[in-house]
């Protein structure tokens, strides 16, 4: 069976046709050109079926109240399916790709900025540590110089203490002999005197000397003070 009808545009459409070529229906011949036209109409029908589908069902309503209020009726529902054209799909995919690329670029830019800031922070930290290291080295060098100077001063102090002790002993001995005088006679020789500075005199006796003969004496001097 063949069904011929007109669509909303006034075009004649044929459905449920035989796939064989050269089939006649009355005065109409379905050749290759008509078959292409029929196939195009079938594709439009399929698109229309995909866009809008309808269904019906029957159900009973039992509202509260008297039994006469119960009834049954048939409902028709139309289900609409939106089909996006290829151009819209391409535009959507292009926009998605652009958004993805923009998002990737933004993420890369943020990562580079973060890495740059981290590098700058590490460089500043290295410079700070180098400065601290130089300060510690200078302190160590100054400490070594101080220790060397301390050793030198200690040695100088010990030397000064020794000199002071020598001077004090000499001064104490001179103080004990200050103002003393004596005459000592041994083997007919006179050991003479001590002056006010307690410089001991040693008299050398020779044979035949008397008290009236001149006396040769040797007066020792205190050790010189070394500076």
Swiss-Prot record:
Q: Where in the cell is it found?
A: Nucleus; Cytoplasm
Return the SUPFAM superfamilies for the record.
Answer: Leucine zipper domain
Entry keyword set? Cytoplasm, DNA-binding, Nucleus, Repressor, Stress response, Transcription, Transcription regulation
Q: Region Disordered: which residues?
A: 44-68
Residues in domain bZIP? Answer: 94-160
Q: In which tissues is it expressed?
A: Expressed in young leaves and cauline leaves.
Q: Pfam family of this protein, just one? A: bZIP_2
Please list the coiled coil stretches: none
> Where is this protein chiefly located?
nucleus
What processes does the entry annotate via GO biological process terms? DNA-templated transcription; negative regulation of response to salt stress
Entry's Gene Ontology molecular function annotations: DNA binding; DNA-binding transcription factor activity; protein homodimerization activity
- The record's region (Leucine-zipper) falls at 122-129
Q: Which GO cellular component terms, listed alphabetically, does the Swiss-Prot or TrEMBL entry include?
A: cytoplasm; nucleus
**What is expression of this protein induced or repressed by?**
Induced by salt stress. Induced by osmotic stress.
- Spans annotated as Basic motif: 98-118
Q: What else is known?
A: Plants silencing BZIP24 show enhanced tolerance to salt stress. Enhanced salt stress tolerance in silencing plants is characterized by enhanced root and leaves development and reduced sodium accumulation in plants.
What does this protein's UniProt record list under function? Answer: Transcription factor involved in the regulation of salt stress response. Functions as a negative transcriptional regulator of salt stress acclimation response by regulating cation homeostasis. Negatively regulates the expression of genes contributing to ion and osmotic homeostasis during salt stress, such as the Na(+) transporter HKT1, the Na(+)/H(+) antiporter SOS1, the aquaporin PIP2-1 and the glutamine synthetase GLN1-3. In addition, targets genes with functions in plant growth and development, such as argonaute 4 (AGO4) and cyclophilin 19 (CYP19).
| PANTHER family on file | BASIC LEUCINE ZIPPER 24, CCAAT/ENHANCER BINDING PROTEIN
Assembly and partners are described as: Homodimer.
This protein is called Basic leucine zipper 24
- Give the organism, scientific name: Arabidopsis thaliana
């Amino acid at each position: 069976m063949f069904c011929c009808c007109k669509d909303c545009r006034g075009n004649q459409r044929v459905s449920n046709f035989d796939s064989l070529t050269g089939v006649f229906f009355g005065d109409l011949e379905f050749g290759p050109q008509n078959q292409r036209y029929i196939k195009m109409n079938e594709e439009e029908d399929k698109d229309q079926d995909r866009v809008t589908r309808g269904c019906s069902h029957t159900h009973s309503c039992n509202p509260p109240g008297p039994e006469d209020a119960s009834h049954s009726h048939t409902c028709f529902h139309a289900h609409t399916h939106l089909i996006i054209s290829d151009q819209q799909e391409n535009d959507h995919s292009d926009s998605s790709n652009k958004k993805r690329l923009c998002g990737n670029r933004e993420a890369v830019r943020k990562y580079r900025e973060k890495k740059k800031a981290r590098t700058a922070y590490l460089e500043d930290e290295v410079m700070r540590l180098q400065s601290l290291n130089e300060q510690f080295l200078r302190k160590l060098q100054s400490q070594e110089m101080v220790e060397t100077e301390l050793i030198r001063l200690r040695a100088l102090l010990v030397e000064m203490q020794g000199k002071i002790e020598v001077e004090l002993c000499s001064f104490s001995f001179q103080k004990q002999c200050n103002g003393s005088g004596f005459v000592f006679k041994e083997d007919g020789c006179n050991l003479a005197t001590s002056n006010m500075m307690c410089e001991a005199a040693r008299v050398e006796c020779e044979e035949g000397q008397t008290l009236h003969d001149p006396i040769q004496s040797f007066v020792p001097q205190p050790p010189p003070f070394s500076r």
